Swiss-Prot record:
Record has Zinc as a keyword: no
NCBIfam families (UniProt xref): aEF-1_beta, PRK00435.1
Alphabetically ordered keywords of this record: Elongation factor, Protein biosynthesis
Signal peptide: none
Identification of the protein by name: Elongation factor 1-beta
Family affiliation: Belongs to the EF-1-beta/EF-1-delta family.
Cited InterPro entries: eEF-1beta-like_sf, EF1B_bsu/dsu_GNE, Transl_elong_EF1B/ribsomal_bS6, Transl_elong_EF1B_B_arc
Function: Promotes the exchange of GDP for GTP in EF-1-alpha/GDP, thus allowing the regeneration of EF-1-alpha/GTP that could then be used to form the ternary complex EF-1-alpha/GTP/AAtRNA.
Domain of life, source organism: Archaea
SMART domains: EF1_GNE
Length: 89
């Protein structure tokens, strides 16, 4: 089996959420077996709301992104977590 890059969009609870603090919390809960690829990027959505885009390298086995999705969803200040792209590397 190989590895895949998974692009994950994390929506904060509100425009008032401190994205710098949220980025640090996200980095702190990346599960074993997943590695952060590059920086966590801010993506403008609308009306001042920005999503965080996280790219992780994970094993391509079934459910490879689930531990990360579950960990990110439990972080205080996170409204929603969605895998937007997965590709083999």
């Amino acid at each position: 089996m190989g590895d895949v890059a998974a692009k994950i969009k994390i929506m904060p609870e509100s425009v008032d959420t401190d994205l710098g603090e949220l980025k640090e919390k996200i980095k702190g809960v990346i599960p074993a077996g997943a590695d952060l690829h590059g920086d966590i990027v801010e993506e403008p959505i609308a009306f001042g709301l920005k999503a965080l885009i996280v790219t992780l390298i994970v094993n391509d086995e079934e459910g490879g992104t689930e531990p990360a999705e579950e960990a990110f969803a439990k972080v205080s200040g996170v409204e929603n977590v969605q895998v937007v792209d997965v590709y083999r590397i």
